[in-house]
Amino acid sequence: MRYFAVLLALVMLFTLPLSAGCAESAAADAPVVVLRVADYGDIYLELYPDIAPVTVENFLSLVDSGFYNGLTFHRIISGFMAQGGCPLGNGTGNSGRNIKGEFSSNGVDNPLQHERGVLSMARSSDPDSASCQFFIMHADAPHLDGSYAAFGRVISGMGVVDALCQNAHVTDSNGTVPKEDQPVITEAARADRAEAEAAAAREAANGAEGGVFDDPASGLSFPMPEGWRLERCENGVAAFTDGAAAFSLTAMDVWRQLGQAARTEYAAAGHTRDTLNTAAFNRGAFAASAGVTEDQLTEQTVNGSLWLAAAPEKDGAVRYYRLGAVNGTVIILAGDEKAVPAMEAVLSALTVE
């Protein structure tokens, strides 16, 4: 009999290293800022006052004043960038102060290229109109070089940027995010470099084969099964792998295992490894396989993330759900006899007390 198991895990995506082609090097005393984004996680930014002193001074002044607290990411284009910091939430607001554009077409040498993870200032057609709105590159965009003031880089939390871009609900090709769906920056504050480096180290450790998965935000820590690792894929999706078996995960949550009865019913309905990803988006199929009603399942759906748990485990499941960073998409994974032991090792570590 073919066995099925569900691996429901916290997915971490990783910050890419600085490009070898970049002329700038991270100074030990470069200021660091953290953006805490509700339901997503923390983005640590290293700023470069040696490259764009006016821009960095302006950004830090706004951070120190609490200006960004409660503002949002209002424009998101996956494969391009995520823009935020507008007090009106529509791209037209400013801080009441405009600064000189520090880029080559405006007479200022700025060697920082608009690569993935780079932080830059938004502006209108006026080269000196930048004020408070910023954007973080989701992918390289060399056509922006020389025309916008790049002034920093993500050093930890690029996975948060990936999640923002992957989960954004936009209404047009310009990346407009409806007000009610805009990710909220709960806090923007200066951060210790040691704090940022520790976050980056956790990302690296969680991405290594073997080792310990450590996520202080959710209070979870468990040994990675032998032969398994969390890796970054070209499309920004992470995958657990154990040789031949690769399991796609876009969830940013901790998930619970289905009971054997639900797995049996799910298999009896004709679902196979190849069809599970498609079925993951069918709430009716989930409700039937889990033995819960459509209303119960809807109740467990938050910001586009499907939450599936057997009724007896609901309280514990919701606890773990809230500990995780939401706005992911759960992918139900089917394993064969070879994969089940490794999957169950992870699930065992996530058992609710």
Q: PLM ranges: what are they?
A:
Residues 1-7:
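Bacterial N-terminal signal peptides that target proteins for export
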Residues 40-42, 129, 219-221, 246, ...:
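Short, mixed charged/polar active-site loops
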Residues 8, 12-16:
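Hydrophobic core
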Residues 41, 203-238:
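N-terminal "mature-domain start" segment
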Residues 193-202, 232-244:
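Short acidic, Gly/Pro-enriched loop/turn segments at secondary-structure junctions
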Residues 22-209, 256, 304, 334, ...:
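Cyclophilin-like peptidyl-prolyl cis-trans isomerases
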Residues 185-186, 192-193, 228, 328-353:
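Surface-exposed amphipathic alpha-helical segments
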Residues 107-110, 234-329, 334-338:
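Conserved polar/disulfide-associated segments of primarily extracytoplasmic proteins
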